Structure formats: structure tokens, C-alpha cells
């Protein structure tokens, strides 16, 4: 009964008690002691009722009280410092020990690259590496569409908790000598001085990041001098004289150096059947020769790991197709409340017809969009598939079919 009393009810009781005080005082002044006693007894009952109501109200407030937990504090600190919550709440050793398995969920067919990156990251984080230098620096080479950028994204999510921790720098924007000012900021007196540098400002605001320098061979040689300082000293000084530290970053550079040799290799003499390993070794040798021609020795020597990615095999393509369908199924579940699955026949058809081993996984990704997603969109618009349905995508009689269960 008393639990249902509101704050207004309690306030009314306080007013009634004050009124009783005035009544008792009046009776005593007029020497009406009997009336004063009766009034005091009624007041005592109301006081008892009032105290019980206050106690019930206090207990209710304690029960409903908002409590600040460790996770709440972690969220606030993460918002202030840009350090991911994962890094604050999960022990780093746990993340580092399972780094390979985390990366393998997203990157297919690049065991050597994943292993090398994981080892280098572990070396950097346990304190064996210079604490002022970046956690790790890598140069990713190899054919297009084999997972160089995907590994960078997976690394950002695994180490720093989110793909948003990836800072992507397109090096084709730094082809001119004066474009160095875009990276670290314009000198005083020049246009854009107040804005700061594109790279230096991003790192200053997001110190825990994976920095991806895409197509690094396109950058002007003067830009490499800035990168040399980052790789060597772990910091740069921007145009305003502020020191920007890279010690909590992972630096990844990708290059298409030797791409033409990968797509159209030159074989002298008679054609000889090569094993997969021989083919990779020959490709790696050609790519590294091109790298030594394009980049200065002092730049190459400062990079922790140079990795030439393997071309994808049929088994890799099948795994990638499964991964693409898993992503599509997750999107359908989240956005449309549709449970989507794909038959083995459909996956095999896509790999058989659309897999291009020289162009990597991208043609396969386009095929899933054009063959499956377009057909699914038509089914949704026609009303044959609705929210909440369980749908199985298959391949029969030369076309994609959807069975609603």
C-alpha cells in the first residue's frame, strides 16, 4: 500500500503534519487539553504512516538507482582518448595469443602473411622492440584482390577493436613534391596553415590506429623522407612544431610493384609445367626485383616485414565464396529479418564461372552482387520473399532460384 504512494502524497502528508502542529498549538493556548491530546494522537498515527512511506520511497530509489560500472567508465575513457574499449577491458595477452585465428576468419589463403604479421605485432607489444617506434611496419606486395587491404582492416579490428581504427592514405594524392605539406601541414604564412596536415592531424586525434599507405610506389620521393623519419624515430613534427607520435600505430604499405609480371609472366624458352611453389617463387623473385628498383635501400631496410601474397587457389576461392555468403546472410538477417542460406551447387557455379585467379577475389565479389543479390532484390520487390522468411538460394537449370521455407 505504502509502496504505491507518490512524491505528491508524501508532500501532502508533510502539509497535514504541519496543520496538526498548528491545531495542537491553538488547543494548548485555549487550555483545551483534551482536544490537544486527541489531535496529538491523530498526528502520531500520521507520523507513523509518513515514516513508513518515506522508508518505502527510499528503498525504491535505492533499487532504481543508476550505477556506474567498469564498462561505463571504459566507454567514457574510450570516447575521450580514442583508445578502443576492447583494449581497456580485455587483456592484451589474450588478444595477441589468438591473433592468427582472428585474422584467418577474414583473410583466406595467406597463412604466411598472417603468421608473419602476428609474430611482428607480438614482438612489438611485449616490449622486445624499441618502445618509441611503431608497433610494426609492413610492406604488402603481390597480385591484386588477394587480401592485402582486407588484412589491414582485419588487423585494425583485431588490435584496436574496430575497422574505424584504419586510417587509409591514398598515395596517388602525394605524387607532387609540394604535396608533403598536405601530409604534415603547410608552413606559417601559407594557405592551409591553420588546418594542419592530413596525416599528422589524424594520428594526433587517433593515436591507436592502423595506417594504410595504399599504392606507395606512386608517392613522390620527398614523401618517402617523411616516412623514413616515422619508421626510424617513431614520430614526425608537424608544421606547427608539434611532435606527433606513431608509437601506438601499425604501419602498412601496399604496392602493385611487379603487378604486370604477375598477370603476364615472361617465360623464356619452352613452356614447362611448374608446381604451385615454383610459380610463387618465380613471381616473388620478379616482384622483389621490381621493389629494389623502385624503392631506396634505406627505405626497404627500415620495414619490419616485406610480404609477397600468394595467388588464390580454387580451394581459397571456395572459402571466399562461403565467406561472402556469410556476410550477405548477416546483412539480410540484420536489415531485412530474412534467414538466407546458399546451396553448395550455387557456390560451385560461382567459383566455376566467375573465379579469375589472376584478378583475385574481386570478380567473385562482383558475381555474388550481380548474380545473387540482384535476383534477391527482384524477389523482394515482387513480394515473393518477405521479412521473416527463411530462404535457401540454389542453382538449378542454369539460373539462381530461391526456395522459401
Regions found by a protein language model. Give the residues of each.
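AAA+ P-loop NTPase nucleotide-binding core of proteostasis motors
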Residues: 1-405
Amino acid at each position: 500500500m505504502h509502496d504505491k504512494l507518490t512524491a505528491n502524497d508524501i508532500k501532502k502528508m508533510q502539509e497535514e503534519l504541519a496543520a496538526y502542529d498548528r491545531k495542537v498549538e491553538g488547543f494548548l493556548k485555549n487550555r483545551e487539553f483534551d482536544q490537544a491530546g486527541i489531535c496529538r494522537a491523530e498526528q502520531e498515527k500520521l507520523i507513523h504512516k509518513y515514516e513508513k512511506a518515506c522508508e518505502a520511497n527510499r528503498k525504491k530509489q535505492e533499487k532504481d538507482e543508476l550505477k556506474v560500472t567498469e564498462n561505463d567508465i571504459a566507454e567514457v575513457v574510450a570516447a575521450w582518448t580514442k583508445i578502443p574499449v576492447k583494449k581497456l577491458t580485455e587483456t592484451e595477452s589474450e588478444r595477441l595469443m589468438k591473433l592468427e585465428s582472428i585474422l584467418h576468419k577474414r583473410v583466406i589463403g595467406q597463412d604466411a602473411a598472417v603468421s608473419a604479421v602476428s609474430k611482428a605485432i607480438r614482438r612489438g607489444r611485449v616490449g622486445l622492440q624499441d618502445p618509441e617506434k611503431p608497433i610494426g611496419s609492413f610492406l604488402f606486395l603481390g597480385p591484386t584482390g588477394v587480401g592485402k587491404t582486407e588484412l589491414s582492416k582485419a588487423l585494425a579490428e583485431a588490435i584496436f577493436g574496430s575497422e574505424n581504427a584504419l586510417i587509409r592514405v591514398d598515395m596517388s594524392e602525394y605524387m607532387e613534391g609540394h604535396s608533403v605539406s598536405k601530409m604534415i601541414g603547410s608552413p606559417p604564412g601559407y594557405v592551409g596553415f591553420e588546418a594542419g596536415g592530413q596525416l599528422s592531424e589524424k594520428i594526433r586525434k587517433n593515436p591507436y590506429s592502423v595506417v594504410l599507405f595504399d599504392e606507395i610506389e606512386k608517392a613522390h620521393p620527398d614523401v618517402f623522407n617523411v616516412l623514413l623519419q616515422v619508421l626510424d624515430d617513431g614520430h614526425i613534427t608537424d608544421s606547427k612544431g608539434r611532435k606527433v607520435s606513431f608509437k601506438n600505430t601499425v604501419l602498412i604499405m601496399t604496392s602493385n610493384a611487379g603487378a604486370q609480371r604477375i598477370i603476364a609472366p615472361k617465360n623464356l624458352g619452352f613452356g614447362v609445367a611448374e608446381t604451385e611453389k615454383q610459380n610463387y617463387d618465380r613471381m616473388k623473385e620478379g616482384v622483389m626485383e621490381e621493389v629494389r628498383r623502385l624503392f631506396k635501400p634505406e627505405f626497404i631496410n627500415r620495414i619490419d616485414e616485406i610480404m609477397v601474397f600468394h595467388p588464390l587457389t580454387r580451394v581459397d576461392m571456395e572459402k571466399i565464396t562461403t565467406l561472402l555468403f556469410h556476410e550477405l546472410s548477416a546483412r539480410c538477417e540484420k536489415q531485412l529479418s530474412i534467414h538466407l542460406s546458399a546451396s553448395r551447387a550455387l557456390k560451385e557455379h560461382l567459383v566455376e564461372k566467375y573465379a579469375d585467379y589472376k584478378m583475385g577475389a574481386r570478380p567473385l565479389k562482383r558475381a555474388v552482387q550481380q548474380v545473387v543479390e540482384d535476383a534477391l532484390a527482384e524477389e523482394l520487390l515482387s513480394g515473393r520473399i518477405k521479412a521473416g522468411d527463411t530462404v535457401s538460394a540454389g542453382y538449378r537449370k542454369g539460373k539462381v532460384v530461391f526456395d522459401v521455407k
